[in-house]
Amino acid sequence: MTAPTRVVVIGADAAGMSAAHQALRTARRTGRELAITVLDKGTHTSYSACGIPYLMAGDVASAEDLVARSGDAHRDAGIDLRMSTEVVSADLSARTVTTDGGDVLEYDELVVATGAPAVVPDWALRPDGTPYGGVGTVKTLDDGASWLERFAEVGDGGHVVVVGAGYVGVEVAEAALRKGFGVTVLTRTRGMSMLEDEMSDLVNVGLCDAGIELVLGAEVTGLELDGDRVTGVHWDGGTRDADLVVVAIGVRPATAFLEGQVELTDGGALRPDPHGRVADHVWAAGDCCEVRRRLDDEWVFRPLGTHANKHGRALGDSLAGGSLTFDGMTDTSITRFSYGEVHLEIARTGLSRSDAEAAGHEPVALLTEGTTASGYMPEAEPIALWVMADRTTRRLLGVQVVGGHGAGKRIDAAAAVLWAGGTVDDLAWMDLAYAPPFSTAWEILQVAARRVAERL
């Protein structure tokens, strides 16, 4: 009798568990026998990290609501799941991994799905390497629970400084406002750097209208402390008192244990092939990886749950003898800022202007403003769309949206055209749904596309 293939998966969240379960499903179809062990240094598995800001805001009742599948459910499916178990080293030539408890596990196939922990700058850390009191990141369920405790401890009327104005920074700023705090957002850029300047400026106006103190071009230089607890933040242009400081400046792949054994990017990421392979008997998926952007064939670091789940599914299928592939993405993302009278849905897909120029395109882009519904309907809210196409080929290159209720998911129609390699004319003339509560007779996305088409 043939021994089962020993599969060790490092990481028990979206990519790792998607890979493990898909491998089991495919193995049943292909007649293979797998023995899958999943190791994770954390205490929670299969949870929505993207939902943590909404837990902090009070939209989500408890941290457990963010858990999609419990550890016992994974074990019942036939997976040997070991939580609170960190892999500290791997020997790819010997095909072994070593845990923090000293256990050495042999494998036939290794799946790296270690994710990407939040970056914490030196100014936020005590000499022992832990964050100062009142300072933290937003990445894990434990982080979310800690912020709820800190919010309750400080109480209404305190002040939160958020460092970083990306998606997480904006979402956390909303959460802090809704919990009764004053909020300052510090960013070294001119706003949301994933947007074009004119679109980022619209978001900046909304944040300020909601009562946020937004400081652009700010480089944090240190903290004001009382003992080892934060009381303020210093940057190159000023100081702000702070009861709490949220660091939201990005993440970095957890791949240090692989250095010198597989090729890593300068940022520490892996680049798996469409099946998920990075080397013989080594696979990878999720936030520890870069993904291929289909529009310009560039590898980019986009740690999103959508990519992690698809990546993991394709990997698991291929590992067990299937043929699924993860064929890249169009760089689509979305978020929301909603407080008081301000509601902004923020979305983008495709290339930026600088990306397009670097890829050799001659981009033509226009900003178009309109409403999310027919103007006579009470649902109608402002919306702005930025659309870009190539002057010669007419190929659609990028779309960005900032607007009120109903604005954000319009990005999906544009993403579909980009996925298919379509033109701005395809977007302008495709058949989209219309009724007055949902759009204007000429859908504003198509008006924006038509205006660009007329400039080519």
Give residue ranges: language-model regions:
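Beta1-alpha1 glycine-rich phosphate/pyrophosphate-binding loop at the start
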Residues: 2-80, 173-197
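Cysteine/selenocysteine-centered motifs that mediate thiol-based redox chemistry or coordinate metal-sulfur cofactors
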Residues: 420-456
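A short, polar/charged loop-to-alpha-helix boundary motif
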Residues: 405-422
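Mid-to-C-terminal Rossmann-like scaffold of FAD/NAD(P)H-dependent oxidoreductases
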Residues: 2-6, 16-17, 290-405, 444, ...
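FAD-binding core/adjacent interface of flavoenzyme oxidoreductases
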Residues: 1-10, 29, 67-159, 217, ...
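A Rossmann-like FAD-binding core segment of flavoenzymes
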Residues: 29, 33-35, 75-99, 105, ...
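Glycine-rich Rossmann-fold phosphate-binding loop(s) that bind the pyrophosphate
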Residues: 11-15, 41, 139-140, 163-168
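FAD-site-proximal beta/loop scaffold in flavoenzymes
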Residues: 130-155, 225, 229-232, 239-317, ...
